[in-house]
């Protein structure tokens, strides 16, 4: 399944979450798109709830179905809780770390920065958004990339960096100090439903 490239605001309303992270998509119309307005959402079956939760998480991180399933299977081989490990793997993707550091305003922007070769990991260019960042690794930008308008705008408005990251706003450099805990990951996701979906 290809990555969704349509209007993010419409998808956000359909899934009931803000995919941009700003919450603006749901401010005026916090209901699914369509001609009938609020109050028209059908009650979902158990399968429907599981599918919706999977789609919420997949679109939140901007991952296609193949990558999503591969990470899910990888998480199954790790010690600990399957669903929690899965979310930690998603959170440790390079594009997501760039977003969490505040070098991009959205994950989509962060993915473009990585794809276009602007991002360095331990001083070496990495252009693979799905690259798994390990604790202790340093994330920075190429010198000429530090003046990009999208980066400057993102850094100006960013006022929060998760506790599992460190960030130097002067150097535009940060690192993953440890893997995140479940309490630091998106609370609006019920990963148990996703485990149930793939276990059917």
Curated annotation (Swiss-Prot):
CDD domains: S4 (cd00165). Keywords: Ribonucleoprotein, Ribosomal protein, RNA-binding, rRNA-binding. The keyword Ribonucleoprotein applies. It comes from the Bacteria. Residues 92-152 form the S4 RNA-binding domain. GO terms for biological process: ribosomal small subunit biogenesis; translation. The keyword rRNA-binding applies. It holds the Pfam family S4. One of its GO terms (molecular function) is structural constituent of ribosome. Gene3D superfamilies: Ribosomal Protein S4 Delta 41, Chain A, domain 1 (1.10.1050.10), RNA-binding S4 domain (3.10.290.10). One of its GO terms (cellular component) is small ribosomal subunit. InterPro entries: Ribosomal_uS4, Ribosomal_uS4_bac-type, Ribosomal_uS4_CS, Ribosomal_uS4_N, S4_RNA-bd, S4_RNA-bd_sf. Residues 22-42 are annotated as: Disordered. Part of the 30S ribosomal subunit. Contacts protein S5. The interaction surface between S4 and S5 is involved in control of translational fidelity. Belongs to the universal ribosomal protein uS4 family. PANTHER family: 30S 40S RIBOSOMAL PROTEIN (PTHR11831), SMALL RIBOSOMAL SUBUNIT PROTEIN US4M (PTHR11831:SF4). One of the primary rRNA binding proteins, it binds directly to 16S rRNA where it nucleates assembly of the body of the 30S subunit. With S5 and S12 plays an important role in translational accuracy. This is Small ribosomal subunit protein uS4. It comes from Bacillus licheniformis (strain ATCC 14580 / DSM 13 / JCM 2505 / CCUG 7422 / NBRC 12200 / NCIMB 9375 / NCTC 10341 / NRRL NRS-1264 / Gibson 46). The gene is rpsD.
């Amino acid at each position: 399944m290809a990555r969704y490239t349509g209007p993010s605001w419409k998808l956000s309303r359909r899934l009931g979450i803000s995919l941009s992270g700003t919450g603006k998509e749901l401010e005026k119309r916090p209901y699914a798109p369509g001609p009938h307005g609020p109050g028209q959402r059908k009650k979902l079956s158990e399968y429907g709830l599981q599918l919706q939760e999977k789609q919420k998480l997949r679109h939140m991180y901007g991952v296609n179905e193949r990558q999503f399933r591969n990470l899910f299977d990888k998480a199954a081989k790790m010690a600990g809780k399957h669903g929690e490990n899965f979310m930690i793997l998603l959170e440790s993707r390079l594009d997501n770390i760039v977003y969490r550091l505040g070098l991009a305003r959205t994950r989509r922007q962060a993915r473009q920065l990585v794809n276009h070769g602007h991002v360095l990991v331990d001083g070496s260019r990495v252009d693979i958004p799905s690259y798994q960042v390990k604790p202790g690794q340093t994330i920075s930008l190429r010198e000429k990339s530090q003046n990009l308008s999208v980066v400057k705008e993102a850094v100006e408005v960013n006022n929060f960096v998760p506790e599992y990251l460190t960030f130097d706003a002067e150097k535009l450099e940060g690192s993953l100090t440890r893997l995140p805990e479940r309490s630091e990951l998106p609370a609006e996701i019920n990963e148990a439903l996703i485990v149930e979906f793939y276990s059917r």
